[in-house]
Amino acid sequence: MRDRRGPLGTCLAQVQQAGGGDSDKLSCSLKKRMPEGPWPADAPSWMNKPVVDGNSQSEALSLEMRKDPSGAGLWLHSGGPVLPYVRESVRRNPASAATPSTAVGLFPAPTECFARVSCSGVEALGRRDWLGGGPRATDGHRGQCPKGEPRVSRLPRHQKVPEMGSFQDDPPSAFPKGLGSELEPACLHSILSATLHVYPEVLLSEETKRIFLDRLKPMFSKQTIEFKKMLKSTSDGLQITLGLLALQPFELANTLCHS
């Protein structure tokens, strides 16, 4: 049977067998099996230093991070550099690279973390978008339903039958009034995901999550007065206010996508 592990998996298996599970032996054995070659020009100095003993590389890494925490933190465990925009972001804020928890936030969040928010956030907002739970966004935006066209015509076929009964009544009364319908579910997924990165405590807390979702409407609408009222009303909740302010770029991006 053909080995599906590939060259890397085969190499790691051989190294693990030879090292007997010892981390120092595994490191030395893997170093010997790696082909010699020049490292990239922007690689940190500790990357191309020979391994004399099991602790030399960790000591070099510790010393290098003290000298240049941003440079040392920009390399993955596999030895490859991270994306350029991440590098630039960390260089602008070197203090963030010094803490592992902050550095982890530079990379995409695992799907299971966002699963807690998807049901109460994205699915609920997407359903209200189709069922008209807020003001219509047909004026001045392309990609939405044109005037006079029933929203049910835009629904996928498997959603038309169970949700058809909601359209027999007045759409705004089908669900409680709350969030607007100016954003598509795909945009909402990006918004909530970005918020989860920057302010996870906002969406992971049951108390602040409901307040945050209820106040997304003035953020993505033209109701300037309501938006100012929303900021004043959340002055006692700093995390919620900061989370809403962090979403302003998404409002501009959504406007450009539909213009």
UniProtKB/Swiss-Prot annotation:
Domain of life of the native organism: Eukaryota
Record's protein name: Protein FAM220A
GO terms, molecular function: STAT family protein binding
GO CC annotations on file: acrosomal vesicle; nucleus
Phylogenetic placement of the source organism: Eukaryota, Metazoa, Chordata, Craniata, Vertebrata
Function recorded in the entry: Promotes dephosphorylation of transcriptional activator STAT3 by interacting with both STAT3 and protein phosphatase PTPN2. This promotes interaction of PTPN2 with STAT3 and mediates STAT3 dephosphorylation by PTPN2, leading to negative regulation of STAT3 transcriptional activator activity. May be required for spermiogenesis or sperm function.
Biological process annotations from GO: negative regulation of transcription by RNA polymerase II
Organism: Homo sapiens
Disulphide linkage map: none
Encoding gene per record: FAM220A
Coiled coil: none
